């Protein structure tokens, strides 16, 4: 089973990916984790990524695509995987399609968690309040202004992926505003 989750920050993609990872025994592939691992292991592509990051630049699609390709080739991905944070743009999605085709693989589903943005901001504010009340540390980008910037960036760069996958007939949508278990049940219906 090979899946992609789409949706804005705070929609519950990570929560759902974790639940499905546990249920189906397939890895959740996070772009950030893959990048850090490649750099730590000093792979050829990891060295190139490190040089770019050390120069304070953004890692190119070419490097990210190569890291994803290498990770998909890992033994633990033989039964499938859930992509988290990739693809972020239509060019990355096109590269992923090409990459999977070359490997004789295909995506089983692209699942978009549809959510109300105003409710997402309230969710984030509640999470901050609960974290502070519990004596925890709040992320620096967990404030309404930063969160709205992340939502805007999502709308501009990542939301067009929905149209891309809808055109190819692979996009399935789920109401991400429901409770966690209801969302999981809806996703499992899609995967059945």
From Swiss-Prot:
SUPFAM superfamilies recorded: P-loop containing nucleoside triphosphate hydrolases
Claim: Transmembrane helix is one of the keywords in the record: no
Record text about domains: Consists of three domains, a large central CORE domain and two small peripheral domains, NMPbind and LID, which undergo movements during catalysis. The LID domain closes over the site of phosphoryl transfer upon ATP binding. Assembling and dissambling the active center during each catalytic cycle provides an effective means to prevent ATP hydrolysis.
Gene Ontology CC: cytoplasm
Region (NMP): 30-59
GO biological process: AMP salvage
Keyword Nucleotide-binding: yes
HAMAP family: Adenylate_kinase_Adk
InterPro entries given in the database record: Adenyl_kin_sub, Adenylat/UMP-CMP_kin, Adenylat_kinase_CS, P-loop_NTPase
The protein's enzyme class: transferase
Function: Catalyzes the reversible transfer of the terminal phosphate group between ATP and AMP. Plays an important role in cellular energy homeostasis and in adenine nucleotide metabolism.
Localization per record: Cytoplasm
Span list, region LID: 126-142
Superkingdom field: Bacteria
Name of the protein: Adenylate kinase
């Amino acid at each position: 089973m090979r899946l992609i989750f789409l949706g804005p920050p705070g929609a519950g993609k990570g929560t759902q990916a974790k639940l499905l990872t546990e249920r189906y025994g397939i890895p959740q592939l996070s772009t950030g984790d893959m990048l850090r691992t490649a750099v730590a292991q000093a792979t050829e592509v990891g060295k190139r990524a490190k040089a770019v990051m050390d120069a304070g630049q953004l890692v190119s699609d070419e490097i990210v695509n190569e890291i994803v390709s290498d990770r998909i080739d890992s033994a633990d991905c033989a039964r499938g995987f859930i992509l988290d944070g990739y693809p972020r743009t239509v060019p990355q999605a096109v590269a992923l399609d090409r990459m999977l085709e070359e490997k004789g693989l295909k995506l089983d589903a692209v699942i978009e968690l549809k959510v109300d943005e105003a409710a997402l901001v309230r969710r984030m504010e509640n999470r901050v309040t609960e974290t502070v009340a519990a004596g925890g540390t709040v992320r620096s980008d967990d404030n309404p202004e930063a969160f709205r910037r992340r939502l805007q960036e999502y709308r501009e760069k990542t939301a067009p992926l929905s149209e891309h996958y809808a055109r190819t007939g692979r996009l399935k949508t789920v109401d991400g505003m429901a409770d966690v278990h209801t969302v999981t049940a809806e996703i499992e219906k899609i995967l059945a």
